[in-house]
């Protein structure tokens, strides 16, 4: 019997970062994180399970993916099959509505959409918490893309306890806008996965990061609760810069920031001096971008 399902999920930007995994296999982070989900950038996915299929196929933006991506999706679908208790292979058709030049990682929305589509196709009846766990197995940040608005990813200590949940802001996110500034389109010399591991294992600054990130998280959540934009902005700026500082303490040291990154940060500071309420947070995707959050 052919089974199919469709879903849409939106990408998110971490305001309080996670940097480093405690468990690489189950994607368990070293610390909790806080994100905001974006309304303009999303992934739409259709998944079809068919007894006649002999392998999993992923069609991304109209093109079949390469062998490396195919292996990754097959591994993920094995997790889905184990959960569902069947061995059907699937055809996955996915469209990313994320501008390539913006440098936004689409894995968050991609795996959140895939998890939700599989849930529908296989009638798994998963709760949002269960969906968050399942999405996390594909991409850690995907755990947060199950939810709109603000979401916190609880690090937990195993597969069962590591999941995201929504943070109630009484709709405050609708009063906020995020601007993405593309710094450059050069590929990273150090991947995020490699950078996380190197920093976790060798940086003398890493423990300092862990010591302060919970404090940052609590302050950010309190700011969201009180709709205190200035406090939220101050916390997320400091948190992002501390994350990048840990990389400079790694052996060997590395950084994702370039001169243009600092130039863009300076522009944000100049805007604040001109009474335009805005703050920056930095990301480290394939194309370095500088998201700027503004109160409107």
Region spans (language model):
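Conserved small/polar residues in nucleotide/adenosyl-binding loops
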Residues: 286-292
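ATP-dependent small-molecule kinase catalytic core of the GHMP/sugar-kinase superfamily
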Residues: 130-258, 262-272
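Short amphipathic alpha-helical face segments that pack within enzyme cores
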Residues: 109-117
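Active-site nucleophile and cofactor-binding loops and adjacent substrate-binding regions
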Residues: 105-106
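ATP-binding N-lobe of GHMP and related small-molecule kinases
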Residues: 1-102, 116-126, 138, 158
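Short secondary-structure junctions
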Residues: 83-88, 270-276
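Short beta-strand
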Residues: 279-282
């Amino acid at each position: 019997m052919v089974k199919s399902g469709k879903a849409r999920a939106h990408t998110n930007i971490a305001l309080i970062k996670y940097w480093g995994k405690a468990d690489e296999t189950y994607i368990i982070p070293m610390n909790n994180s806080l994100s905001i989900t974006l309304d303009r950038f999303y992934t739409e996915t259709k998944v079809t399970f068919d007894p006649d299929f002999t392998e999993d196929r992923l069609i991304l933006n109209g093109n079949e993916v390469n062998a490396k991506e195919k292996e990754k999706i097959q591994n993920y679908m094995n997790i889905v099959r184990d959960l569902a208790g069947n061995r059907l292979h699937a055809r996955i058709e996915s469209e990313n509505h994320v501008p390539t030049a913006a440098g936004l990682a689409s894995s968050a929305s991609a795996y959140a959409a895939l998890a939700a589509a599989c849930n529908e196709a296989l009638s798994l009846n998963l709760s949002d918490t269960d969906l968050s766990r399942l999405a996390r197995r594909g991409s850690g940040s995907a755990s947060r893309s199950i939810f709109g608005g603000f979401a916190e990813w609880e690090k937990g200590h195993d597969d069962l306890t590591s999941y995201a949940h929504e943070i109630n802001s009484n709709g405050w996110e609708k009063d906020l806008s995020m601007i993405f500034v593309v710094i450059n389109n050069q590929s990273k010399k150090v991947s995020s996965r490699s950078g996380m591991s190197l920093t976790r294992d060798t940086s003398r600054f890493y423990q300092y990061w862990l010591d302060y990130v919970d404090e940052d998280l609590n302050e950010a959540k309190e700011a969201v609760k009180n709709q205190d934009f200035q406090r939220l902005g101050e916390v997320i700026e400091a948190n992002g810069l501390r994350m990048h500082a840990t990389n400079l303490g790694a052996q060997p040291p590395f950084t994702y920031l370039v001169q243009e990154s600092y130039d863009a940060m300076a522009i944000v500071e100049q805007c604040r001096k001109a009474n335009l309420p805005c703050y920056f947070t930095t990301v480290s995707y394939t194309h370095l971008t500088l998201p700027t959050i503004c109160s409107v």
